[in-house]
From Swiss-Prot:
Gene: cplane2
Binding residues annotated for GTP, in chain numbering: 64-71, 177-180
Name of the featured protein: Ciliogenesis and planar polarity effector 2
Positions of the UniProt region annotated as Small GTPase-like: 52-255
GO MF, any single term: GTP binding
Annotated GO biological process: cilium assembly; exocytosis; protein localization; protein transport; regulation of exocytosis; regulation of vesicle fusion
SUPFAM superfamilies: P-loop containing nucleoside triphosphate hydrolases
Record's GO cellular component terms: ciliary basal body; cytoplasm
Compartments, as annotated in UniProt: Cytoplasm, Cytoskeleton, Cilium basal body
InterPro entries membership: P-loop_NTPase, RSG1, Small_GTPase
Superkingdom field: Eukaryota
Keywords: Cell projection, Cilium, Cilium biogenesis/degradation, Cytoplasm, Cytoskeleton, Exocytosis, GTP-binding, Nucleotide-binding, Protein transport, Transport
Similarity annotation: Belongs to the small GTPase superfamily. Rab family.
Signal peptide: none
């Protein structure tokens, strides 16, 4: 996974902290026997008294056309098995992902609680209440396209217009999925640069494939998976933390 160059300057979060000895200790709270821990809506990581941290909770609505890779994207970040076949999500599905980060000007880490909301395109069209429910109290909307489907990329501006009104003050992030299928890509780096220059939105790139498994083969290697997901999780943390700081008047917004 990789984060494309974004228009917002200056990191507020240390993007390399997760690889430090202290960062690895905190990562231990979301791992169990080399595998990822999975958390329900009311569960949270258990930290020892020697590992103080604050919790910052955010709701993220993941949207995109059918087959764009929404469910696979969330599964990748959560350490779940990436589905080998496409199945339309029925109704609304929520997934909690915890990620520890340390602000650049603080010695006290923050554990981000990302609550991802996903729903199938069919459900959105059939039930009028689904879209308002997904957007209610959302901090960010993630607009997904597939690198293997150029039309899904070209549809992103229209997708944004269909999903959000100009008055809706939420973070907007574009995610390109299926980066692992580079031999079939229909979207180039020049396309991404032109898009960012025009729309002034951050673009992230995601591999929609399972990472290595643990030695016995039963389950995915949680620590390796976290390293793969770190650029995107750090990127989302940076965007949401900066947004909060701008709203609070603690830092300036984008130029």
């Amino acid at each position: 996974m990789a984060l494309a160059e974004a228009p917002r300057p200056g990191p507020l979060m240390d993007p390399e902290w997760h690889g430090s000895p202290e960062g690895k200790e905190y990562l231990g709270c979301i791992l169990r026997k080399k595998k990822r821990k999975f958390f329900g809506l009311i569960e949270r990581p258990v930290l020892s008294p020697q590992l103080p941290a604050d919790i910052a909770s955010y709701k993220l609505f993941v949207c995109g056309r059918s087959g764009a890779g929404k469910t696979s994207f969330i599964a990748k970040l959560a350490g779940l098995e990436v589905p080998s076949m496409h199945h339309e999500t029925t109704g609304i599905q929520t997934t909690c992902v915890y990620w520890p980060v340390r602000p650049t000007h603080s010695a006290r880490p923050v554990i981000f609680r990302f609550q991802f909301w996903d729903c199938g395109e069919g459900a959105l069209r059939k039930f009028d209440h689904i879209l308002p429910a997904c957007k209610e109290m959302a901090d960010a909307v993630l607009f997904l396209f597939s690198f293997t489907d150029r039309s899904s990329f070209e549809d992103v501006p229209a997708l944004i217009s269909r999903t959000l009104g100009q008055e809706e003050d939420v973070a907007r992030v574009v995610i390109g999925t299926k980066l692992d299928q580079y031999t079939h890509t229909d979207v180039t780096e020049n396309d991404l640069r032109d898009f960012q220059r025009t729309w002034q939105l951050p673009v992230m790139r995601v591999r929609s494939v399972n990472g290595p498994r643990v030695a016995e083969g039963r389950g995915l290697d949680g620590r390796v998976g976290l390293v793969e997901c770190a650029p995107v999780l750090n990127g989302l943390a940076e965007i949401l933390w900066r947004r909060d700081q701008v709203i609070a008047g603690l830092v300036g917004g984008a130029d």
